[in-house]
């Protein structure tokens, strides 16, 4: 690793610790030439699978789109930003764990509904009504009845 102060190519690791629940390594380094110390963070580069849309087109996974959908569903509901971040993290972890290069958008929608169901029932109904394109009140009733079981 190059020293950010003098650009020397030789640095030594003084201390290493796991951070971010074990998903990153924090390293304290010292330059062997100028003796300045600096911190680096190391983490695995995890590639998200591509998304196969309902019409068959493929596009890169868009984390912002996932977050926007969840935020819209939980809008004005008693759900903390921490809970939202955890739910989004679970969805992304599940997608990575499939080991697939491509996943259908339907899978992402179903994962989103699972997370919303455990977070907030009203948010779940909001998302499901748009995602499943409810046409009339009876479809809302069926979704609510499913929640009450």
Swiss-Prot record:
GO MF terms, alphabetically ordered: ATP binding; double-stranded DNA binding; zinc ion binding
Free-text remark on how the cofactor is bound: Binds 1 zinc ion.
GO biological process: negative regulation of DNA-templated transcription
Zinc finger (unnamed): 3-34
Keywords associated with the record: ATP-binding, DNA-binding, Metal-binding, Nucleotide-binding, Repressor, Transcription, Transcription regulation, Zinc, Zinc-finger
Residue ranges occupied by any ATP-cone domain in the UniProt entry: 49-139
Organism domain of life: Bacteria
Cofactors demanded by this protein: Zn(2+)
InterPro entries documented for this protein: ATP-cone_dom, NrdR-like_N, RNR_NrdR-like
Family: Belongs to the NrdR family.
Function: Negatively regulates transcription of bacterial ribonucleotide reductase nrd genes and operons by binding to NrdR-boxes.
HAMAP family membership: NrdR
Protein name: Transcriptional repressor NrdR
